[in-house]
C-alpha cells in the first residue's frame, strides 16, 4: 500500500513522515529536495520562475517518478505524488510563468506517466495548513532556495490543493489541520484506522478532532 502525504510548502510533510516512520511499520520516501539543491535548481526556480519553471517541474516529475517506480513491497509513506507536481506546473502556467507550449508538453508527458502510475495513487494524507502558517514555517526553517517564496505564491498553491483534494471522491483522503497538529498516539490511531493499518495488538482511540 502506498500513502502519499500532500500539502503546501511548509505544511509539515517531512515532520509527519518521520513521525509515522517511528510509529508504524513502513518504508518512507522523502521528496528529493537534496537532489534539486545539488544542481541549484530550487534556488534558481524561486529567483526566476518564468525562466526555470519548465526545467524545474520536469525535473521534479522525473525524479519523483523514479522513486515511485522503485518502491518496495508493503506499506510506503511517500512525500508528495506526481499529481501535486501538476499543481505547481498549473500555477506557473496560470501566472504566465510557463508558456503554453511548455505547459502542453508537460501535460502530455505527465498524462502518459500518470496513466501508468495512477493505480499507485489511491491513499492521501492532506496536511492542510493556512498559507500564513506555511509562510512562517518556511522562514523559520530557512531552507536553501526558499527565502524568496512570497506569501501570495503559497496562497495560490493552497487554493489549488483545496480544489484538488477537498472534494475528491476518487481517492481515499484523510484531511488533517496542519496548523495545530499534535504529534501523538491519537494521530497515529487515526491514520491506522483510515488506511486499515491496524493489527490485532493495537489499542486505539479515534476520538480525534481536526
What are these regions (language model features)?
Residues 13:
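Conserved lysine of the Walker
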Residues 8:
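P-loop (Walker A) phosphate-binding loop of NTP-binding proteins
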Residues 22-63:
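Conserved substrate/cofactor phosphate-moiety recognition/catalytic segment
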Residues 135-210:
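NTP-dependent small-molecule kinase module
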Residues 5:
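Hydrophobic anchor at the beta1->P-loop junction of P-loop NTPases
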Residues 16-17:
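Post-Walker A alpha-helix
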Residues 63-101, 125:
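A basic- and aromatic-enriched beta-loop-alpha substructure that forms the phosphate/nucleotide-
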Residues 88-159:
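A glycine- and Lys/Arg-enriched "phosphate-lid" helix/loop adjacent to the NTP-binding pocket
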Amino acid at each position: 500500500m502506498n500513502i502519499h502525504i500532500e500539502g503546501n510548502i511548509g505544511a509539515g510533510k517531512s515532520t509527519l513522515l518521520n513521525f509515522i516512520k517511528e510509529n508504524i511499520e513502513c518504508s518512507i520516501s522523502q521528496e528529493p529536495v537534496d537532489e534539486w539543491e545539488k544542481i541549484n535548481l530550487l534556488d534558481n526556480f524561486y529567483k526566476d520562475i518564468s525562466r526555470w519553471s519548465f526545467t524545474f517541474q520536469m525535473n521534479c516529475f522525473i525524479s519523483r517518478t523514479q522513486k515511485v517506480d522503485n518502491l518496495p513491497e508493503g506499506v510506503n509513506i511517500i512525500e508528495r505524488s506526481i499529481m501535486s507536481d501538476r499543481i505547481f506546473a498549473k500555477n506557473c502556467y496560470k501566472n504566465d510563468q510557463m508558456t503554453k507550449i511548455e505547459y502542453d508538453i508537460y501535460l502530455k508527458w505527465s498524462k502518459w506517466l500518470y496513466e501508468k502510475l495512477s493505480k499507485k495513487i489511491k491513499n492521501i494524507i492532506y496536511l492542510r495548513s493556512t498559507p500564513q502558517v506555511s509562510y512562517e514555517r518556511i522562514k523559520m526553517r530557512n531552507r536553501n532556495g526558499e527565502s524568496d517564496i512570497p506569501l501570495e505564491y503559497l496562497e495560490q498553491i493552497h487554493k489549488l490543493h483545496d480544489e484538488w483534494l477537498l472534494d475528491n471522491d476518487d481517492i481515499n483522503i484523510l484531511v488533517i489541520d496542519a496548523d495545530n497538529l499534535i504529534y501523538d498516539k491519537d494521530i497515529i490511531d487515526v491514520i491506522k484506522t483510515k488506511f486499515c493499518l491496524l493489527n490485532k495488538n493495537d489499542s486505539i482511540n479515534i476520538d480525534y478532532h481536526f
